[in-house]
Amino acid sequence: MIILITNDDGFESEGIRLLKEIAQNFASEVWIVAPDADRSGAARSLDYPVKQFIKISQHSEREFSVSGTPADCVIIALNKIMNKKPDLILSGVNIGSNVGDDICYSGTIGAAMEGAARSIPSIALSQVYHDKIDWNNTKIFAPKVIAKLMKVGWPKDIVMSINFPATEKVKGVEFAEQGEYNIDGDLTFTENLNGSLSLNWSREHSGSGSVDKIKGGFITITPIKLDFTDYDILNAMKNSCAEEFSSIANTPIASD
């Protein structure tokens, strides 16, 4: 098996080194193509359309850093660096959870989505922490969870997001929805001497889905769709609103 690893915390992150160790349990080849700096919060954004250039640095035969986003890294790995299509993409291990609205912001999730968009099985892995990061639960349980997922399989346009709790004892594995945060939370701005602002964002969870289960000591697995369409609302609007909107195209355009 050929595995491609990336992340959003950067090429030097502890999490990606741990993920390399984990991947070696399954793979004949492990490739790392990751951002050359921390790109947390990059989502599935791309740098190359704006920058027009990307720097690729080779660190060993199969390890590269890229001056771009996590999604850039996946695109460049598949189209420039690797000579074969990977069988699996692993993104992470992220420092901190990816639940609730984090999923929209996360470069870890974004990189996995880029892989899934190309019909490559893709898994995002995240380790919850409080004061200090402890990778123990990921180290122990990630190989087992990945192996089980690969055995049962899942649709190629779905990303599997795994979150590992920070609790001393893991109670089990749960399949769970992404959950919710209070989007406003406690937002604090501090003005620095140079006139810039430092931002601290503390959010409370709603007590649902992955957010609640992780806090209770469970590993969570959340399937994430590439297609954001709400088909229930779409069909309802087609049935109830189509005629209302059809008149727009028939409205005469006033001449100057």
UniProtKB/Swiss-Prot annotation:
EC number: 3.1.3.5
Residues that bind a divalent metal cation: 8-9, 40, 94
Pfam families the UniProt entry points to: SurE
SUPFAM superfamilies linked to this entry: SurE-like
Cofactor(s) the record lists: a divalent metal cation
UniProt GO cellular component terms: cytoplasm
Subcellular localization, as worded in the UniProt entry: Cytoplasm
Catalytic activity: a ribonucleoside 5'-phosphate + H2O = a ribonucleoside + phosphate
Keywords: Cytoplasm, Hydrolase, Metal-binding, Nucleotide-binding
Gene Ontology terms, MF aspect: 3'-nucleotidase activity; 5'-nucleotidase activity; exopolyphosphatase activity; metal ion binding; nucleotide binding
InterPro entries: SurE (IPR030048), SurE-like_Pase/nucleotidase (IPR002828), SurE-like_sf (IPR036523)
Binding note for cofactor: Binds 1 divalent metal cation per subunit.
Coarse class of the protein's main subcellular location: cytoplasm
Family the UniProt entry places it in: Belongs to the SurE nucleotidase family.
Role summary: Nucleotidase that shows phosphatase activity on nucleoside 5'-monophosphates.
Protein known as: 5'-nucleotidase SurE
